[in-house]
Amino acid sequence: MLALTFAMSGIAYLLGSVSNAVLISRLCDLPDPREYGSHNPGATNVLRSGNRLAALIVFLLDMLKGTIPVYLAWYLGIPPLYLGFIGIAACLGHMYPLYFHFRGGKGVATALGALLPLGLDMGSFMIVTWLIVLLFTGYSSLAAIGAALLAPLYTYCLKPEYTLPVAMLCCLIILRHHENISRLLQGHEPQVWSRHPLKRHRR
């Protein structure tokens, strides 16, 4: 079982390393999301380009990077604790992608996707938390941090066997937001609906 867990973790990392924000931006003739806005290759920053459809596609594909390996591992009978580590591997791939010089995103959508096979209730609580904070503040980063802070509590109440890996994953997500936290404290963090002047992508 341990060998299978390592193999699935490797697959999860490689799948997570696919930077959908960069690829979809190229397909839609949008600028590289690493070069404008928050410089984060994720759905929120793609949304700042003004292309909502592209942002939605990126969000869904990033979620699938977490859902697919964790669901396959669950189907293969891998124990709960190891399922959590496979989800972490997918998020590490998103954060430090092998194919894109290790310049990745924050891992929020991928983490959410990884939680869905573990329980729709946990995923739903995280989505609701994220939406509430976003609607009240307008900051996607603050919404992600709020959801990450509460996710271990939700997990402990609903699926306690997953608490440790979920807590580890949430710590990783919060650490990845250290620049956002600094900008929030300084009042320089862009809101999710703020648009940035963009240059056309050069082929």
Curated annotation (Swiss-Prot):
Where would you find the membrane-spanning parts of this chain? 4-24, 68-88, 104-124, 125-145
| Pfam families cross-referenced by the UniProt entry | G3P_acyltransf (PF02660)
Question: What is the recorded membrane topology of this protein?
Answer: Multi-pass membrane protein
One Gene Ontology CC term in the entry? plasma membrane
UniProt-recorded Gene Ontology molecular function terms: acyl-phosphate glycerol-3-phosphate acyltransferase activity
This entry's Enzyme Commission designation comes to 2.3.1.275
Which HAMAP family does the protein's record reference? PlsY
Alphabetized NCBIfam families for the sequence:
glycerol-3-phosphate 1-O-acyltransferase PlsY
The family annotation for this protein states:
Belongs to the PlsY family.
Instruction: State its role.
Output: Catalyzes the transfer of an acyl group from acyl-phosphate (acyl-PO(4)) to glycerol-3-phosphate (G3P) to form lysophosphatidic acid (LPA). This enzyme utilizes acyl-phosphate as fatty acyl donor, but not acyl-CoA or acyl-ACP.
Assembly mode: Probably interacts with PlsX.
Recorded protein name is Glycerol-3-phosphate acyltransferase
